[in-house]
Amino acid sequence: MAVGMLTVPQAVAYALLAGLPAQAGLYACLAPMVIHALLSSSRQLIVGPVAIAALMVASTVGQHAAAYSDAYLGITTVLSLQVGVILILLRALQVGGIVNLLSHPVISGFVNGAAVVIIISQLAPLTGIATTSRVDDGAVDRIVLLVRFVTEVNPTAIALGVGSLLLMAAVRRWGPALVRSGAKVGGDGDVRHALGRTGPVLVTVLGTAVVAGFGLDVGVVGSVPAGLPELTLPLLDAQLWWDLAPNAVLIALVAFVESYSIGKTLAARQRRRIDSHQELLALGAANIGASLSGAYPVAGSFSRSSVNYASGARTPASALVCAVIIVLTLLWLTPLFANLPHAVLAAVVIVAVYELADFRSVVRDWRFYRGDVLTHFATFAGVLLAGVEAGLLIGVGISVVLFMRGSARPHIAVVGRLGDTPHFRNVKRYEVRTWSHLVAARVDESFYFANADTLESRLAELVDNPEGMPEDGDSAGGQAVEHLLIIMSAVNFIDTTGLEMLQRLTHRLARRDVAVHFCEIKGPVRDQLEHVAVDEWLTGRVFQTTDDAFNTLTEAAGKWIWRDVPANTRD
C-alpha cells in the first residue's frame, strides 16, 4: 500500500520530466510492473518510471518531436520497444557482462551529473517561471533561460514548492522518530523507515487541496483522462528506428545497471542472490509491455523498492498490490490531478534525485585511486555540458583509456626466495635470497597488444641490470645472468601480439646465452601455449612452480646473496 501511494506522485512527476502527459507515467506502472513481478528473480524490486530514464527519454525524443505531442508519445513507445528488445537480446546472447563497461565511477559521475541537470530543469516549475525551454535542453541552456525570465517568478508557486521541500525533509528527518515515540505502528525500524518516505504523498495531497480550496493562480497538471491504457502499436519507420538505436542501447544499459544494483542490494540484506540473466529478461519484457501500453522506458526505482522492502514485502505480490492501486487511480481518481501544482511535483522530483546523488564517494576514491576521480568528474562534466548520452560515452571512453594505460605499463617484480621456504617475494620489499645468474620476474598482467613492447623492453633490461642485485656481480663471484624465469601466475591470457613478443624476447636473449623459462602458468594459458608448440622455440623449460624452477636452476649455482630490506615493507 505504501509503495502504491508513493508511486502515484512520482509517476506523474517523472512523466512531465520526460515530456509526456501525466497518464503516461501511470501507464508505466501497470503492465511493466506486473510483467516484471511475474518474471523477476528479485522479491522486492519495483520497476516503473524513474528520473534518470525520464531525463534520457527527454534528451532522445526531444530531438525528433515537440514535448507532450502525439508524435512525441509515438516515438517514445518505439524507444521503449527498442530498449526491451535490446535487453532480451543481451539475455539471449548471454552477454550481460557488457554492462561492466559502466564502471562505478562512470555510473556515479553520470548519476550525479544527471541529478544536477534534473534539479536545474525543475527550478522553472518550482518557481512558477513559464520558460520556452525544450525538454532536451542542457543544463547551461536552462540556466540561461532561468536568468532571462527571472522577473516572471510566481511567489505563490515558490511558496508551494519550497514548502513542499521543507515538509518532505521534515517527514524524512523526524517522521520515524515521532512514530517511535508515539503509538507503535508495526513497532520496528522498517515500518518507521517506510513512513519516513511518505513525504511525496503528503505534499501531493496537501498541495492539491490548497490549490483547489483557495483557487491559487499556479501551473497545474490539468485534466488527465480516466481509464486504463489501450494497446499501442509502435511506429514502423525504419529511419526513426535507426536514429533512436544508439540512445536506446545506452538507456537499456543504464536501466539494467540501475535495476540490477538495487535488486542485488536488497537481496543481499536477506542473504539471497538474484539471477542477472533472469533480470535482463524481466526488465526487457517490462519495457516491451511499456511500449505496448503507451508508456516510456522503465527501470528499477530505488526509493519505491526501498519502501517496498522496509514495508515488509518478501514476495513479488507487493508489486501486484501497487498495480491495483494504480488501476484504482486511473479509474476513479484522475479528476484530482486537475489541481495538482507543478511546483509540488518539481519538489517531489528534486527530493528523489537528491537522494540518488552521491558525492562523498569521490573523497574516498581520491584517497584510493585518483584515476576514478578523473573518470567521475569527466562523466559529470560531460553530462552537464554535452548531454546525458555524450557524458556517459565520455565516461566509458576515459575509463577504458585509463585501464589500457595501466595495463600497458604492468608491474614487474624481481623475486627471491624467502629464507628456506618455498615462498618468493619482491626483492625491494623483503629480505630474500637471490642468485646473480638467475633473474626471476613476476609479471602482474596478461600479455597482449597494449603492453607487449613495454614488457619486452623491461624484461630485457632486467637481464642487463637485475633490480636489487649487484650490477657488477662482485658479491656473487662475477657470474653473468644465464636464466630469465618469467613467473606467469598473474597472466590470464596471451594474444598473438603477446606471443610474438615472447618469441622475439626468447630469440633475442638466446644470442646472449640467456635461457628463458616459464612457471606458474594457468591452465587456459598453458592450453594456448601448447597450440603453438612452445617446446620448439622456448630455450628454457616450463616449470610447474617457482620453487621447482629455483631448485633446478640454482642447485649448482654456488653462492647466493641476502637482500636486506626493512622488515616493515609490504608485498
Predicted features by range, described:
Residues 460, 547-558:
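A short, amphipathic alpha-helical segment
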